[in-house]
């Protein structure tokens, strides 16, 4: 079985969630499969193994799981990027576009030092609004965003292209057509 098919087969698709017409790509089944989880993390890490990565930033919530594992393998620190109001210390924030409206994310102001090399990690990239906001937030405090990594890309929705337009290389392990 090829790597792509192996990983794709561990992702559960839930139709009409969270609303009619949406095909939700659920990675909890991938996370529960020890072999698939290890292979996915190894593949996310591979391009940067042996290079200097200072921090891995994970987007709430599934990006925490993947980002923590990636940070561990790279011997890098981990930085949580959370929804507004969830972090206890002084924060820096960024508004970002959602399908209907806007939201705000934040991180601790001292989580990344200027010039540190950071990889952004999340489970999936769709329209790219959240990831774009995270890149801008990291850059706002002086981070060098080396790349953005995802298990799943939904290329029809254009998110990866949006990040590449910001000069951020994008690594996705698998892609699903549609939304």
UniProtKB/Swiss-Prot annotation:
Q: Where does the record say this protein resides? A: Cytoplasm
Q: What class of enzyme is it?
A: transferase
Q: Which residues cross the membrane?
A: none
InterPro entries the UniProt entry points to: Ade_phspho_trans (IPR005764), PRibTrfase_dom (IPR000836), PRTase-like (IPR029057), UPRTase/APRTase (IPR050054)
Give yes or no: UniProt keyword Glycosyltransferase.
yes
Tell me the pathway: Purine metabolism; AMP biosynthesis via salvage pathway; AMP from adenine: step 1/1
Query: Which GO terms are recorded in the biological process aspect for this UniProt protein?
Result: adenine salvage; AMP salvage; purine ribonucleoside salvage
EC numbers: 2.4.2.7
What this protein is reported to do is described as: Catalyzes a salvage reaction resulting in the formation of AMP, that is energically less costly than de novo synthesis.
> Subunit structure, briefly?
Homodimer.
Q: What is this protein called?
A: Adenine phosphoribosyltransferase
Tell me the lineage of the source organism: Bacteria, Pseudomonadati, Pseudomonadota, Alphaproteobacteria, Hyphomicrobiales
- Its gene is apt
């Amino acid at each position: 079985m090829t790597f792509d098919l192996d990983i794709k087969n561990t992702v559960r698709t839930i139709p009409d969630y969270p609303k009619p017409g949406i095909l939700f790509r659920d990675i909890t089944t991938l996370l529960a499969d020890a072999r698939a989880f290890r292979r996915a993390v190894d593949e996310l890490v591979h391009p940067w193994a042996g290079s200097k990565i200072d921090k891995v930033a994970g987007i709430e919530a599934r990006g925490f799981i993947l980002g923590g594992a990636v940070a561990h393998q790279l011997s890098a620190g981990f930085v949580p990027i959370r929804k507004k109001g969830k972090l206890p210390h002084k924060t820096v924030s960024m508004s970002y576009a959602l399908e209907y409206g806007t939201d705000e994310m934040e991180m601790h102001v001292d989580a990344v030092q200027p010039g540190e090399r950071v990889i952004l990690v999340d489970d999936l990239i769709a329209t790219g609004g959240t990831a774009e906001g995270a890149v801008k937030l990291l850059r706002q405090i002086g981070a060098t965003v080396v790349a953005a990594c995802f298990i799943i890309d939904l290329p029809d929705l254009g998110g990866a292209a949006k990040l590449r337009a910001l000069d951020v290389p994008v690594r996705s392990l698998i892609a699903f057509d549609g939304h």
